[in-house]
Amino acid sequence: MVDTSEITTLLFDWDGTVVDSAGVGLTAFERSFAALGVPFDHDLYREAYSPNWYSVYEALGLPKEKWQQADDLWVHHYGELNVEPIAGALETIAELKRRNYRLGVVSSGTECRVLREIEQLALKDSFEIVICNEQMKQKKPHPEGLQSALSALGCTRKVTAYVGDSPEDIEMGQRANMLTVGVRSDYPTSWKLKNHNPDILIESLGELLHYF
């Protein structure tokens, strides 16, 4: 079993890790591409999915001049839909707080959306730091977001773990030289997690409590 005794801080990806947004996100993509008059290839989406939307747009053949419009449409359509927490997420986060872990979020999602969902789920007091797309010049898997969180919290990588559901999350944590936890989700690339060798691989977020 991995030694987690030095870990005092847990940073979480948001989509697919804390909130069950895979289906909602896909619907938002479908509606956005339809509004732009661009065919949406589900097979290509599954193969190319990444927290970096622009790599998805590129793989799906969306012209670069439409990327910003696609972003705006996605946020609009996503906002029309309801997002629920991952099963057991709220209870797990509450228990980690009770165990005195410092918690934060590092997400590729837009700040307005992630903060809104944190508020809706009554998690505002649970997270000391929230880093979103707007605060990261370099996107996942570049470690900038994690480095910014460490700096804001005044802690080191040696006492920090990053929890995420995508290969990019694991690579991001590895490039930041911190302990990584992969958690399965319904996102298309989640099955690739094992190939990226996270320090801990779990099937559900609740399993974190076996390690921390």
Predicted feature residues:
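Active-site neighborhood of HAD-like aspartate-dependent phosphohydrolases
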Residues: 2-46
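Conserved Lys-Pro-Asp/Glu-containing loop-to-beta segment of HAD-superfamily phosphomonoesterases
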Residues: 9, 139-170
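A metal-dependent, Asp-based hydrolase signature
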Residues: 35-36, 47-78, 87-95
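Conserved H-loop
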Residues: 39, 63, 124-128, 156, ...
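A short, structured active-site edge motif that brings together acidic residues
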Residues: 44-45, 49, 123-139
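Short, acidic loop-to-helix structural element flanking the phosphoryl-transfer center
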Residues: 79-105, 111-115, 143
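Structural recognition of alpha->loop->beta junctions
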Residues: 122-132, 192-212
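Acidic, Mg2+-coordinating phosphoryl-transfer loop and its flanking beta/alpha structural elements
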Residues: 161-200
